[in-house]
Amino acid sequence: RQGIRPLDRVVLQLPNTPEFVHWYLALVRIGAIPVLALRAHRHTEVRHFIRASGAVAYVVPDVAHHFDYRPMATQMQGEFAGLRVFVVGEAGAGQTAHAALLQGQPDDEVTREIRAAEAAVDPAEVATMLLSGGTTSLSKLIPRTHEDYVLNARLCGRAGGFDAQTVFLVILPLGHNYNLASPGILGAFYVGGTVVLAPSTDTAEIFRLVQQERVTVIA
């Protein structure tokens, strides 16, 4: 309903929250391409990602770890005509709140469009754009295809002993390949395992989650 189509690039800059998972899976399901930014990236990096990928949308939290992402998103809107901004939390002027997207049910026409988009996804097409380490300059975009990334997650999960009893605790950023698909959350989901998202790197919180959720794998 928001006009995001197959092969559209969307810069995704969210912390380790359920909304990251919702956005990532929704985008790849219809053949749109998430460009994964890390929470520490600021104007210079985000501008580069939008320009290099040709992104049509940018997804951010309102405030995370004492930083308000909305003014930065507003600046990007001023620099890139037509850029849509979606905010998890309270949206700023000219931005769309994530919660507003969840109101009501999609009508029959939208449902048909979604199903058609899902059916048309080419396994050999780009599914995700990861970032290089950026040790010598701004990070480069690394395209990963649907078939490549599913195989990557499946084989890494097999090597890691993932199965339906796996309870995977995510601590490192989901925007990294490691915790996304090596084997990451995709490896856990592939075998029907459980994913637990740590809200911080606080040691006491981590140990509490390990005990409470009976965690079997940490990354």
Q: Can you say where each PLM-predicted feature lies in the sequence?
A:
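Conserved AMP-binding/adenylate-forming core of the ANL superfamily
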Residues: 1-25, 42-47, 99-106, 144-147
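Structural core segment of the AMP-binding/adenylate-forming
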Residues: 2, 30-103
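A short helix-loop-beta submotif of the ANL/AMP-binding
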Residues: 9, 15-35, 39-43, 51-58, ...
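Conserved S/T- and glycine-rich ATP-binding loop of Class I adenylate-forming
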Residues: 10, 27, 126, 131-135, ...
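Conserved AMP-binding/adenylation subdomain of ANL enzymes
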Residues: 31, 150-167, 177-217
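Short hydrophobic/charged patches on amphipathic alpha-helices used for structural packing
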Residues: 46-47, 118, 204-207
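Adenylate-forming
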Residues: 60-72, 172, 201-202, 215-219
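Conserved pre-ATP/AMP-binding loop-to-beta segment of ANL
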Residues: 87, 92-93, 105-131, 138, ...
